């Protein structure tokens, strides 16, 4: 079985004590690649991911300014993205987007940061990793407003089927996190049942959103646990776990080609 964790925050302090070990545990569990978004507002974020990528080439980096940090977005962040892309140091721009649940940044600043980074992604020819929480209509409008055609990943999907369908129509893949395993996530599982197989991804969003059976145990989420989300998604789709794993891995590899070795190293 080969799986990809399409979104993990291995740069954060929760992994300072065992960052490399967490990657090794993931590989032992069947994970062959991990995509890690760096936070450009935290100077220590990208070096942490770059260190992992140097040791484990199947750990890939993205970078951007998240909706939560949009209040701190400045022009220099765009210059940084241009430099990173020019050096081949990132595979995508993200995680970027809108979050109307927490509203940690004013919405006008969220919109500005999203619009500017979408425009730059188009200029650079890079896909984006989008965050959308209670903001589906405005995410769609932003993508349309920038005429962004490169596609990418709608990560940790929790919106409705109408939003999923609209983003699928715009060339995006839809990624499901451990939320899919939660007992009260029946509506989300209904959406997951409708997404075309060739557009599905799985992720952990580590260290957050640990899937059942780890949810509530006090254990930090990590990439090895992506198998639990894949297991539930396989059940939703009526597929063997191995087939679902291979399908989602192939979907990821179309957007981010990589050497799919057995170990992920």
What does each model-found stretch correspond to?
Residues 1-265:
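Mid-domain alpha/beta scaffold segments of enzyme catalytic cores
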């Amino acid at each position: 079985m080969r799986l990809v964790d399409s979104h993990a925050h291995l740069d954060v302090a929760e992994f300072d004590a065992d960052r490399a070990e967490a990657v090794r545990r993931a590989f032992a569990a069947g994970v062959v690649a991990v995509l890690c978004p760096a936070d450009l507002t935290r100077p220590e974020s990208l070096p942490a991911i770059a260190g992992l990528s140097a040791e484990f080439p199947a750990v890939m980096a993205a970078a951007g300014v998240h909706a939560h940090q949009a209040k701190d977005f400045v022009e220099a962040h765009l210059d940084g993205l241009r430099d990173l892309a020019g050096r081949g140091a990132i595979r995508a721009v993200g995680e970027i987007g809108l979050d109307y649940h927490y509203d940690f940044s004013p919405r006008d600043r969220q919109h500005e940061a999203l619009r500017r980074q979408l425009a730059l992604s188009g200029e650079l020819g890079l896909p984006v990793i989008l965050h959308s929480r209670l903001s589906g209509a405005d995410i769609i409008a932003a993508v349309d407003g920038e005429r962004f055609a490169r596609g990418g990943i709608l990560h940790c999907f929790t919106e409705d089927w109408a939003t999923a369908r609209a983003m699928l129509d715009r060339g995006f893949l839809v990624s499901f996190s451990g939320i899919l395993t939660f007992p009260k996530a029946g509506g989300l599982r209904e959406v997951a049942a409708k997404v075309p197989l060739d557009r599905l991804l799985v992720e952990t969003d580590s260290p957050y959103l640990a899937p059942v059976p780890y949810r509530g145990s006090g254990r930090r989420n990590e990439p090895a646990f992506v198998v639990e989300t894949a297991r539930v998604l396989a059940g939703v789709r009526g597929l063997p776990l191995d087939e679902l794993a291979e399908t989602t891995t192939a979907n990821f590899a179309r957007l981010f080609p990589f050497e799919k070795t057995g170990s992920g190293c």
